[in-house]
Amino acid sequence: MNQSLGVLRLTRGVIALALASVASGCSSTGADRTAATPAAANPAATEPVKWECPAGYEVKEGLNVDFPHKGMKRAFIVYPAKNVSGPAPVWVPMTGSVESTNDNLTVARSGANSILADHGYTVIAPVRACANQDPNIRGERCNGPGSNGWNWNPWFEGRAADPSGEHWKNDEGPDSSFFVAMVQCVGTKYKLDARRLFLGGISSGGTMTNRALLFRSNFWAGGLPISGEWYVTSDDGTPLSFDDARAAVAAAPTKIHQGRVGPYPLPAKVGPLIVMTVWGGEKDLWNCTRPDGSRFLCADYRPSTQAGSNFFSAQPDVVHVACSSTHGHMWPQLNTQEFNRWALDTLASHPKGSDPRSFKLTQPPEGYTCHVGPFTGLY
């Protein structure tokens, strides 16, 4: 779960009290990746990727630890693509607050994203900094409010609502830059398709996806934010309470809302990208726990995902797909592996630099409703 405004500190593990709301959607494509016909490309719109590692670092299959980045030692897991002769598309999946990195990679209800390596994707899974390089750490260490100017603990994904967050208004933070460095290093050992670099995640991982795309749209080809936050603010960047953020989006559901998920102000232009936003339906909510053990609603993923879809859909070089289902605040539960492959195949059908006008959305798996553009009908 992600939180938006932290005026009062409570616990679930520990939790920041108020949130800017969220609403998102889910997207994918039924076409087989190898059979997909890429859209007309504009390679000039992309920047070349430099495959390089920190001095002396060597990548291996499986868990990689002690990766030096911005004064920290980070970890990531590599599942090389199978049955691919040329450069493979890349999938960088992220867990949220409660489940571990290995859950997200191997447990069915958490996405089991490692299976995508069997379908031709090189899967590179970053381990959260809060987990101290241990991919088995769950919410006992990572679920709760952030520190040092960050709103939420699992990922460095949104600036705090108090003055400490000011530092991150136009600084991407150590996770967004780590993901880029990680992929660049993996590319020294495995052939990677520089025009098909994708990332995505659930909850805080979805929020982190939004942040990475907003700060690094020159690197990523696209992303899959599932129930991610936008941390909606007022137009001048002033943080809003949970209730005020919900009300702001409800009052103007088609507006481009500023948010603490990205730089302030939001970029005038991003892309080229393909972004698929997933909203888990009416049950895509999160309850936090007060110190006395009582529960209260602290996250609603309708308004934040609406806000994210509005921004990306308004960008001329971005294809945005809005998808909805009924699984609530979880990794998509209906036909999970079919959804995962369909979503990644949809992303891969639109390599970086492709003409958005050439994009064709295919039928999603049963249980999902998707369309090109922002969410409609949520308000």
From Swiss-Prot:
Active site per the UniProt annotation: S203 (charge relay system), S309 (charge relay system)
Reactions it catalyzes: nonane-4,6-dione + H2O = pentan-2-one + butanoate + H(+)
Enzyme class: hydrolase
Keyword Signal: yes
Position of the signal peptide: 1-23
EC number: 3.7.1.7
Alphabetical keyword list: Hydrolase, Signal
A molecular function GO annotation: beta-diketone hydrolase activity
InterPro entries per UniProt: AB_hydrolase_fold, Plant_Biomass_Hydrol_Est
UniProt KW Hydrolase keyword: yes
Family: Belongs to the peptidase S9A family.
Role noted for this protein: Catalyzes the hydrolysis of 4,6-nonanedione, a beta-diketone compound. Also mediates hydrolysis of oxidized polyvinyl alcohol (PVA) in the second step in the degradation of polyvinyl alcohol. Not active toward the monoketone structure.
Summary of subunit composition and partner proteins: Monomer.
Name used for this protein in its record: Oxidized polyvinyl alcohol hydrolase
